[in-house]
Curated annotation (Swiss-Prot):
It comes from Campylobacter curvus (strain 525.92). Pfam families: Arginosuc_syn_C, Arginosuc_synth. Its main location: cytoplasm. It is an enzyme of class 6 (ligase). It catalyses: L-citrulline + L-aspartate + ATP = 2-(N(omega)-L-arginino)succinate + AMP + diphosphate + H(+). Keywords: Amino-acid biosynthesis, Arginine biosynthesis, ATP-binding, Cytoplasm, Ligase, Nucleotide-binding. This is Argininosuccinate synthase. The gene is argG. One of its GO terms (biological process) is L-arginine biosynthetic process. ATP binds at residues 11-19, 38, 121. It comes from the Bacteria. L-aspartate binds at residues 123, 127-128. Pathway: Amino-acid biosynthesis; L-arginine biosynthesis; L-arginine from L-ornithine and carbamoyl phosphate: step 2/3. GO terms for cellular component: cytoplasm. InterPro entries: Arginosuc_syn_C, Arginosuc_syn_N, Arginosuc_synth, Arginosuc_synth_CS, Arginosuc_synth_type_1_subfam, AS_cat/multimer_dom_body, Rossmann-like_a/b/a_fold.
Length: 406
């Protein structure tokens, strides 16, 4: 029953949709609303969200605006990149990885303020509704989850605008605001809707907000060195930085050199296909560099097992199962594999390309020049290969002698 909810924590951006939701919750549920606005690097000024919430009657003590950039990168982005996680071969999971953190903090604020409900602005067609709500139920299953898009009759843009106008909610589009449905954080920007709903329609060049076109990138390449400790980047060109600082700097470098644009059609967890365009400049560099440092610090068995586990791990994140036992189990295995992933990777950035120029590890290098040299060596006896090959061929030999044809 709607009257059973007394206080609701709303994931609030300050935009039109969540402002309408705020007013709708007050009107339909007759409840007190707590707004939570997370700074996860979306690059927008967040204080206007406070003014809008106040204008809609939210008490000052019920307005939470928090900088979660360091926590986002340290506890969510970096663990995911230790796994080299990619969904369906291309998507670096920029939206997927942000939702668990926002939902977790909502549940924590609910406990802090004595709220008995939570709400979000995700629509009934997308993956985000699943990601938010699975996180809510994992953290506090006693919270009432309110999803306006699955309840109200404001099912068109015209109805939403009429409701906003009726209730004095500002519907003025900010100058320079993209007409596309966008999601932005420190890892990526995504674009959906409008002409992108036709998968055969190329995106306009002025849609991209972050990365320059590779054609317009500098004609001179840039070489950087990324330092790694236990699988996480910790420095750029020898300068130690915090997780958020690392990603911010890699974003700047990647965007400048036209790195990180992506146009794909993905399979949503809810069953439909969706076309989206993404900009992930820093993440694109991190993925390539991390695989490079792993190539000399992980043994073959560990590296291959990680590659086998990665699609399942990526799917769990995409589908919203960040707080699931199976994701935590996989994370423990992945983190164990990173204990010796230490060293430096030299990377060249040039017109949309990330090229590995070198990789080194002072204490954890498994690349042995003594064993792999093409020159004469004294540590490897080629005759040992004879028995190795025969043992591996034994099943073929037996099958062939029994008349099996291959």
């Amino acid at each position: 029953m709607k009257k059973d909810v007394k206080k609701v924590v709303l994931a609030y951006s300050g935009g039109l949709d969540t402002s309408i939701i705020l007013k709708w919750l007050q009107d339909e549920y007759k409840c007190e609303v707590v707004t939570f606005t997370a700074d996860i690097g979306q690059g927008e000024e967040l204080e206007p969200a406070r003014k809008k919430a106040l204008a809609l009657g939210v008490k000052p003590e019920n307005i939470f605006i928090e900088d979660l950039r360091e926590e986002f990168v340290r506890d969510y982005v970096f663990p995911m990149f230790r796994a080299n996680a990619i969904y369906e071969g291309e998507y670096l999971l920029g939206t997927s990885i942000a939702r668990p953190l926002i939902a977790k903090r909502q549940a924590e604020i609910a406990k802090l303020t004595g709220a008995d409900g939570v709400s979000h602005g995700a629509t009934g067609k997308g993956n985000d509704q699943v990601r938010f709500e699975l996180a809510y139920y994992a953290i506090n299953p006693n919270l009432k989850v309110i999803v306006p898009w699955r309840e109200w009759d404001l099912n068109s843009r015209e109805k939403l605008l009429a409701y906003a106008e009726k209730n004095g909610i500002d519907i003025t589009r900010k100058p320079g605001k993209s007409p596309y449905s966008m999601d932005a954080n420190l890892l990526h920007i995504s674009y959906e809707g409008l002409v992108l709903e036709d998968p055969n329609h190329a995106p306009e060049n002025d849609m991209w907000r972050w990365c320059v076109s590779p054609k317009d990138a500098p004609n001179e390449s840039e070489i950087i060195t990324i330092g790694y400790e236990k699988g996480d980047p910790v420095s750029i060109n020898g300068k130690k930085m915090s997780p958020a600082e690392i990603l911010t700097e890699l974003n700047h470098l990647g965007a400048k050199h036209g790195i990180g644009r992506l146009d794909l059609v993905e399979n949503r967890y809810v069953g439909m296909k969706s076309r989206g365009c993404y900009e992930t400049p820093g993440g694109t560099i991190m993925l390539k560099a991390h695989r490079a440092i792993e190539s000399i610090t992980l043994d073959r068995g560990s590296a291959h097992l990680k590659d086998e586990l990665m699609p399942r791990y990526a799917e769990l994140i995409y589908n919203g199962f960040w707080f699931s036992p199976e994701r935590l189990m996989l994370q423990a295995a992945i983190d164990k594999s990173q204990e010796h992933v230490n060293g430096e990777v030299r990377v060249e950035l040039y017109k949309g390309n990330v090229t590995i120029l070198g990789r080194s590890s002072k204490d954890d290098n498994l690349f042995s020049e003594a064993y792999c040299t093409f020159e004469e060596d004294s540590v490897y006896n080629p005759k040992d290969a004879d028995g190795f090959i025969k043992l591996n061929a034994l099943r073929f030999i037996i099958a062939s002698k029994n008349g099996r044809k291959f």
